[in-house]
From Swiss-Prot:
Subunit of the V1 complex of vacuolar(H+)-ATPase (V-ATPase), a multisubunit enzyme composed of a peripheral complex (V1) that hydrolyzes ATP and a membrane integral complex (V0) that translocates protons. V-ATPase is responsible for acidifying and maintaining the pH of intracellular compartments and in some cell types, is targeted to the plasma membrane, where it is responsible for acidifying the extracellular environment. Subunit C is necessary for the assembly of the catalytic sector of the enzyme and is likely to have a specific function in its catalytic activity. GO terms for cellular component: cytosol; extracellular exosome; lysosomal membrane; vacuolar proton-transporting V-type ATPase, V1 domain. GO terms for biological process: positive regulation of Wnt signaling pathway; regulation of macroautophagy. V-ATPase is a heteromultimeric enzyme made up of two complexes: the ATP-hydrolytic V1 complex and the proton translocation V0 complex. The V1 complex consists of three catalytic AB heterodimers that form a heterohexamer, three peripheral stalks each consisting of EG heterodimers, one central rotor including subunits D and F, and the regulatory subunits C and H. The proton translocation complex V0 consists of the proton transport subunit a, a ring of proteolipid subunits c9c'', rotary subunit d, subunits e and f, and the accessory subunits ATP6AP1/Ac45 and ATP6AP2/PRR. It comes from Homo sapiens (Human). Belongs to the V-ATPase C subunit family. This is V-type proton ATPase subunit C 2.
Length: 427
């Protein structure tokens, strides 16, 4: 499953034993894979400031998740015919999202823990706001390009009455630069081909004999040329209409046709450059983080390997990719990493608010093995940690019991700190 539960309990002896009981039960019952989730010590400040920060982090969490989902969808749209490979591009620091979450390590360089918590949160908020602003401008430019290209493509996909003719006709099909003669294009229904050949010369005076030629046809009819004197154009149009022949209003302008062809070629080139299908396939299965080793303490599977890549490897894999796809990959990674740091901050703040000072709690990441086991997993957690809040635990088991002074829906409150992480970003 791509679902994770991030929980915390006090770090005293009694609750560490409760965590061990939880791990034993969930392991034996095959309910979840559990991993300790390392969160550094932050400058706490006042409890009042933490209350305000808790609300701000909740909003930032929602915003960050929305942003990475939009970015994931943008990758889908850019890749178009290669949608099956989208997941390979949605990485965090060069590894798949599940590996990054289960091997999470706080980025001390990017978010120094010596700063006040409010400063750390502000740094993340500004980073995400900038990514969103860039995303809007880049996707707007791409969508404009895509729309312009689609409009041009529609012109070449209609029937003979509406489609552009610049890719069909050629200079040789027309009498050009003549003071007296002009070549018209006439759409003739397929059942009327024979009638056209027999009658076009007599539809009006001054039609050049044997001047008709079939240029192209679709399932409904054909496009024929006919050359005549300019002064009988209107008379010819009238007679043609009476015989179910339609004169297509078109005059060969070499410069205009060349301009239209160049515009189509330019748009196709610009769109292709945003995502090139020749991009190098992403490598999988690398087992080291080069510049900073991933340090994890698995509760359920101590032999589970960490995965990672060097920055140089990630850069080499980006060769051949268009600028928009490359930007989306890099900034999706940045936004996702920021999002998981927000989760860590929320656990820290809520744990201090709920368990008090001095700071002493243990965070654990649980990955339910299957959807059908989540109800049983929740029952195990509520049973193991019910001592943390007897009133809340009782109300969870009995929905009719209200918690005095607690405004949350009882179904959203648990005796332990709990946050949900959903990695199903393309659903």
């Amino acid at each position: 499953m791509s679902e994770f539960w991030l929980i915390s309990a006090p770090g005293d002896k009694e609750n560490l034993q409760a965590l061990e009981r939880m791990n034993t039960v969930t392991s034996k019952s095959n309910l979840s894979y559990n991993t300790k989730f390392a969160i550094p010590d932050f400058k706490v400040g006042t409890l009042d400031s933490l209350v305000g920060l808790s609300d701000e982090l909740g909003k930032l969490d929602t915003f960050a998740e929305s942003l990475i989902r939009r970015m994931a969808q943008s990758v889908v749209e850019v890749m178009e015919d290669s949608k099956g490979k989208v997941q390979e591009h949605l990485l965090a620091n060069g590894v798949d999202l599940t590996s990054f979450v289960t091997h999470f390590e706080w980025d001390m360089a990017k978010y120094p823990v010596k700063q006040p918590l409010v400063s750390v949160v502000d740094t993340i908020a500004k980073q995400l706001a900038q990514i969103e602003m860039d995303l809007k401008s880049r996707t707007a430019a791409y969508n404009t390009l895509k729309t312009n290209l689609e409009n041009l493509e529609k012109k070449s996909m209609g029937n003979l009455f509406t489609r552009t003719l610049s890719d069909i006709v050629s200079k040789e099909d027309f009498v050009l630069d003549s003071e007296y003669l002009v070549t018209l294009l006439v759409i003739v229904p397929k059942p009327n081909y024979s009638q056209w050949q027999k009658t076009y010369e007599s539809l009006s005076d001054m039609v050049v004999p044997r001047s008709t030629k079939l240029i192209t046809e679709d399932k409904e009819g054909g496009l024929f040329t006919v050359t005549l004197f300019r002064k009988v154009i209107e008379d010819f149009k009238t007679k043609a209409k009476e015989n179910k022949f339609t004169v297509r209003e078109f005059y060969y302008d070499e410069k205009e046709i060349e301009r239209e062809r160049e515009e189509m070629a330019r748009l196709l080139s610009d769109k292709k450059q945003q995502y090139q299908t020749s991009c190098v396939a992403l490598k999988k299965g690398s087992s080291t983080f080069p510049d900073h080793k991933v340090k994890v303490t698995p509760l359920g599977n101590p032999d589970r390997p960490a995965a990672g890549q060097t920055d140089r490897e990630r850069e080499s894999e980006g060769e051949g990719e268009g600028p928009l796809l490359r930007w989306l990959k890099v900034n999706f990674s940045e936004a996702f990493i920021a999002w998981i740091h927000i989760k860590a901050l929320r656990v820290f703040v809520e744990s201090v608010l709920r368990y008090g000072l001095p700071v002493n709690f243990q965070a654990v990441l649980l990955q339910p093995h299957k959807k059908s086991s989540t109800k049983r997993l929740r029952e195990v957690l509520n049973s193991v940690f019910r001592h943390l809040d007897e009133v809340a635990a009782t109300s969870i088991l009995d929905a009719s019991v209200e918690i005095p002074g607690l405004q949350l829906n009882n179904q959203d409150y648990f005796p332990y700190v709990y946050f949900h992480i959903d990695l199903s970003l393309l659903d």
